[in-house]
Amino acid sequence: MSNYNVSLVGPAPWGFRLQGGKDFNMPLTISSLKDGGKASQAHVRIGDVVLSIDGISAQGMTHLEAQNKIKACTGSLNMTLQRASAAAKSEPVAVQKGEPKEVVKPVPITSPAVSKVTSTTNMAYNKVPRPFGSVSSPKVTSIPSPSSAFTPAHAATSSHASPPPVAAVTPPPLSASGLHASANPSAAQCSSPPNTGKPAVHVPRQPTVTSVCSESAQELAEGQRRGSQGDIKQQNGPPRKHIVERNTEFYHIPTHSDASKKRLIEDTEDWRPRTGTTQSRSFRILAQITGTEHLKESENDNAKKANSTPEPSQQSASPLSAAESLESPGSNRPVVAGLRSAAAFKPVGSTSVKSPSWQRPNQAAPSTGRISNSASSSGTGAPMKPAVGPPQPSDQDTLVQRAEHIPAGKRTPMCAHCNQAIRGPFLVALGKSWHPEEFNCAHCKNTMAYIGFVEEKGALYCELCYEKFFAPECGRCQRKILGEVINALKQTWHVSCFVCVACGKPIRNNVFHLEDGEPYCETDYYALFGTICRGCEFPIEAGDMFLEALGSTWHDTCFVCSVCCESLEGQTFFSKKDKPLCKKHAHSVNF
């Protein structure tokens, strides 16, 4: 290796150009030289490889990094180069190291490949998958797969590294296509011997194996056609049209009996999953013979209606009853009557429909701030009783919540207090379940099943204890605040009490102004007490610089000449028709 060092005295230009870099997958080399330049005078040649720049190795540098490194050398440029004659020998190896991965090579059709396949065709696990009796031609083994012509060389080598039974499978489409027949154990069912009796009867019962075998039969037929015609056109996959026309013997249905012929020619209901209410095909054929087909269909329709109607009716009736109990808790109408009317479509003698009961009311609408009295009614149809408790707070955004009563059912939740399974009716509050007797106030220990509660500092308190110990007092009405609190003027207020004096609307968290100790919203304050700038017609807020001129108030930046917009603050100005003018335009402009 003939390496040499070059030291070029600054400043730039250095008289050469670079090419390559890590981002181009090429070494940094000299691409051109300027005649009479500094690099040419230092005997630098075109094609020399740059090994280092200013003592830093250039092997990992990108093209831009190398340029910036050279630009940073202002006083002198020191480089280590390698002659192009010595670097030319190792150049092709380094550049073309990754090219074999990108070269697309078609699989050649050679005679050694035929001999290799024919030598292994006697093995039992290397037989060609034949689609139920079709005879495959030995010529097809020498025809490559259409997709193998587009397979990279490294993919071909990886396929040869697989075990011999898998690599020696005769039809290449099974290993190259997306059918996964070589990796799927069920594909071995396709290679049935040709002497199998009556194979076509099982075609509708095995859709997966049939699709795999039809694909392989299609590709074998396509390979035979291209091999006989000498077609060299490469495709990106086997054609998938006219499968029935090319492989008509595969879809041949033997006429051994009228029953099997009728099963294959009629509709394909066997492909659908059967339920307990649908009759078998033999039963329907018998019904057609005896003339009772329409009678059975009407009975089946009634059975389907009986099975499909009660389940939604229970789900839809229980939210309806819950909604009725929320809107009119004082009504004495039994909720069970609504369920019975919804389940009136149950046919006589049907045992698959359960009698209406309080099994699924836990799917009703969530709690809306009132007590759901569904727990007080049992399956016997006892009338509901209205909730007894303190009056509802007047705050619309109150913090007081109510527990939701859930009757006993299939669900067995865990109590949030004792961490035990709840057997029977329970309460739902704050996303947790509670025993009714354990949902008590943290201070007075009274039950909160039928009264409101508030969560404060991780504990639950009834609304009376919360109002007594925690709720702040309103600065206007002197009542306890159970909802949103407004903190203003060092006091706490109800939202409905802290309002604008002029318009009476709640100020909430908006900006307000005080005038004579009374709060005003921003709009009313500037309309009543604010000063409007004559120039911009916007209010002059507190802290704004302003001046008075021509009988009006102006922002200091708004008092300008009406013609040239020059600021007139602290200067002599003139007025024509109440418009300020500077000295230049005072006598030259007429309005």
Swiss-Prot record:
Post-translational modification N-acetylserine, affected residues: S2
Molecular functions (GO terms): actin binding; actinin binding; metal ion binding; muscle alpha-actinin binding; protein kinase C binding; signaling receptor complex adaptor activity
UniProt biased composition (Pro residues): 162-174
- Identify the domain of life: Eukaryota
> Which cellular component, as a GO term, is one annotated location?
glutamatergic synapse
Q: Which residues form the PDZ domain?
A: 2-85
PTM sites of type N6-succinyllysine: K89
Q: Which residues carry this modification: N6-acetyllysine?
A: K89, K346
Summary of the tissues where the protein is detected = Detected in brain, in neurons, including in hippocampal neurons, and glial cells (at protein level). Detected in heart and skeletal muscle.
Where does cross-link Glycyl lysine isopeptide (Lys-Gly) (interchain with G-Cter in SUMO2) occur? Answer: K89
Residue spans with biased composition (Basic and acidic residues)? Answer: 258-273, 293-304
Q: Which residues lie within the region annotated Disordered? A: 125-240, 255-334, 348-398
The protein's UniProt keywords, in alphabetical order, are: Acetylation, Cell projection, Cytoplasm, Isopeptide bond, LIM domain, Metal-binding, Phosphoprotein, Repeat, Synapse, Ubl conjugation, Zinc
Q: Which residues carry this modification: Phosphoserine?
A: S2, S111, S134, S137, S228, S260, S313, S318, S355, S357
Ranges in a coiled coil: none
Q: Where is the composition biased (Low complexity)?
A: 144-161, 310-329
Question: Pfam families attached here?
Answer: LIM (PF00412), PDZ (PF00595)
Q: Where is the composition biased (Polar residues)?
A: 134-143, 183-195, 207-217, 349-380
Q: Per the UniProt entry, what is one GO biological process?
A: regulation of postsynapse assembly
**Per its database record, what is this protein's job?**
May play an important role in the heart development by scaffolding PKC to the Z-disk region. May play a role in the regulation of cardiomyocyte expansion. Isoforms lacking the LIM domains may negatively modulate the scaffolding activity of isoform 1. Overexpression promotes the development of heart hypertrophy. Contributes to the regulation of dendritic spine morphogenesis in neurons. May be required to restrain postsynaptic growth of excitatory synapses. Isoform 1, but not isoform 2, expression favors spine thinning and elongation.
Assembly? Interacts with various PKC isoforms through the LIM domains. Interacts with actin and alpha-actinin through the PDZ domain. Interacts (via LIM domains) with SIPA1L1/SPAR; this interaction may occur preferentially with isoform 1.
- Name-wise, this protein is PDZ and LIM domain protein 5
What's the source species for this entry? Rattus norvegicus (Rat)
Q: Encoded by which gene?
A: Pdlim5
